[in-house]
Amino acid sequence: MPQTQELDQRIAELEMKIAFQENTLEELNQALIDQQFVLDKMQLQLRYMASKLKDLQSSNIASQAEETPPPHY
């Protein structure tokens, strides 16, 4: 009988560990989904900013290298 109790206790401990691991895995999965959402949003913003920068560079505004220095130089 004591051996059966030990086995039951070990099974219960293993079941608790599995439940904890499943919960942790779900939390990690959700964190990964959230991070991917943020990454997608940042990539979209980066594309937008790159497009805006390209538009500014191709406009009639001279680059800093082409600008004449201010009179106090």
UniProtKB/Swiss-Prot annotation:
Designated name of the protein: Protein SlyX homolog
Family named by the database record: Belongs to the SlyX family.
Disulfide bonds: none
Native source organism of the sequence: Histophilus somni (strain 2336) (Haemophilus somnus)
NCBIfam families: PRK02119.1 (NF002556)
Origin superkingdom: Bacteria
Gene behind this protein: slyX
Coiled coil ranges: none
